[in-house]
Amino acid sequence: MSLDISSSQQFILAAEKLYPQMGYQKLSVRVLAVEAKLSSGLFHHLFANKDDFMAQVFAQHFQRAFGWLAPEFAEDAPPLERLRRLYFQAALSLRDEVPWITRMMIDSADNVATAQQSMQDLVLREFRIVREMVREIAPQLSDEQAMQAISQMQTSILLPILAANTFNRIRVVPDELRQPILQQLTDDALAQRVDWMIKALFSAKETQ
């Protein structure tokens, strides 16, 4: 049994290492076996199929990267401060996970079901937590107004992180802009952007 557990983890760790560069289609059982220094036959013994395996890979990686994203996050802080902390932590985690997230977006666009489902689960988990926080902070908002506020935070705080990293990696921006763009991804810059958006959307609550 211990062999199976250890071998399963070797395959999963191999996938975690190779997936951002190779993606779902190129990450074959043979490639995984070579990286894990195990046999292809053992892979088929341990996992029902490739989709089952990748679902486990995504789940383990996301637990490590986004395990903090839970309803009890910063539960001792006031509601507005909880929201501020959540978006700052989300920005930091997303910045660190850009290679993974962008690869999963590519695979999702190619209709890789396991990538689509894992991404949807993560986004939905964050959305539900944020929605409850917004309802607690501003109960007077209609559902439509709350959705608008959430969409503004998503598009103003999180999506630029993906865009900035992607543009830098594929080198489509002028050299003069590359460093200023990267400076927008520092901890201080991300914290400032979160503060700006929180104040812009919930300024009446800032004194509470």
Model-derived features with residue positions:
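Amphipathic alpha-helical linker/stalk segments
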Residues: 2, 57-85, 127-134
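Helix-turn-helix
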Residues: 10, 14, 18-52, 56
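Hydrophobic alpha-helical connector segments
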Residues: 56, 70-96, 140-153
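Amphipathic alpha-helical packing segments from all-alpha helical-bundle domains
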Residues: 63-70, 113-138, 147-151, 187-195
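Phosphate/oxyanion-binding loops and surfaces in catalytic or ligand/nucleic-acid-binding neighborhoods
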Residues: 64, 93-97, 111, 156-164, ...
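Short secondary-structure transition hinges
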Residues: 67, 92-131, 175-183
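Short alpha-helical scaffolding segments that buttress acidic/His motifs in well-ordered protein cores
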Residues: 87-90, 104-107, 153, 157, ...
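C-terminal peripheral helix-coil segments that are non-catalytic and often amphipathic
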Residues: 128-136, 140, 156-208
